[in-house]
C-alpha cells in the first residue's frame, strides 16, 4: 500500500538530503545513525511503557530509510554495498520495534498472550523479508503481498501511539486495544504475505 507513495516522499526529503550532502555527510553514515537511533529508542521506550513518546522518536530515525537512498542517487552512487547495508540494517530496526513491544507486554503490559503475539508478528515480518531476499538471490521477484515493510511499520507505530495515548487518558480507555488488534493483523498479514510470495516464486520457477 505505502510503497506507492515512495516517489512523493522522496521529493519531500530532497531539501534535507541536499543539506546533509553539503555538510559532507555520507549515505552510509545516515543509514547507521538511523538504525542505531531507531533500535535504541524502541528498546528503551517501549519496555518502559513510554508508548506515546516512543513512536515519534522511532519515526524520527526511520526517516533515514528515505534519506540514504535519496542521497546516494544525488551522488550518482548505486552501489551493491549501499543496498546490502540498507536492507540488512532495516531488519534490525524492524526487529527492535517488535522486541520492544514484546518486552512491554512481558513487563508493564503484563500479558503472556500478547508477548507471544508480538514475537509471532516479528517472526512473520522477518520471514516476508527473507522470502523476498532469497527469491532475488535466485534472480526472481517476490514483491507481492498485503503487508510490505512500510505497511508493517505504519500499522505498528500508529497502534502503539494510540494505545499509549489511551493509557495516559488522551484517548478513550478502550483504545488500548489498538496494539493487540494490530499485532493480530500483522501476524495474519505476515503469514499471508509469506504464502503469497512463495506462490509467486513457485510460479516463476515453473514458467
Swiss-Prot record:
GO biological process: phospholipid biosynthetic process
Keywords attached to this entry: Cell membrane, Lipid biosynthesis, Lipid metabolism, Magnesium, Membrane, Metal-binding, Phospholipid biosynthesis, Phospholipid metabolism, Transferase, Transmembrane, Transmembrane helix
Transmembrane segments: 21-44, 50-67, 88-106, 112-131, 152-170, 176-195
Location of this chain's protein in the cell: Cell membrane
GO CC field: plasma membrane
Leading EC class: transferase
Its membrane topology: Multi-pass membrane protein
Positions contributing to Mg(2+) 2 binding: 65, 86, 90
One Pfam family this sequence matches: CDP-OH_P_transf
Required co-factors: Mg(2+)
Cofactor detail note: Contains a di-nuclear catalytic Mg(2+) center.
EC numbers, comma separated: 2.7.8.-
Keyword check for Transmembrane helix: yes
Keyword match Lipid metabolism: yes
GO MF term list: magnesium ion binding; phosphotransferase activity, for other substituted phosphate groups
NCBIfam families assigned to the protein according to its UniProt record, in alphabetical order: PIPSynth (NF045883)
Subunit architecture: Homodimer.
Protein name: Phosphatidylinositol phosphate synthase
Species for this entry: Cutibacterium acnes (strain DSM 16379 / KPA171202)
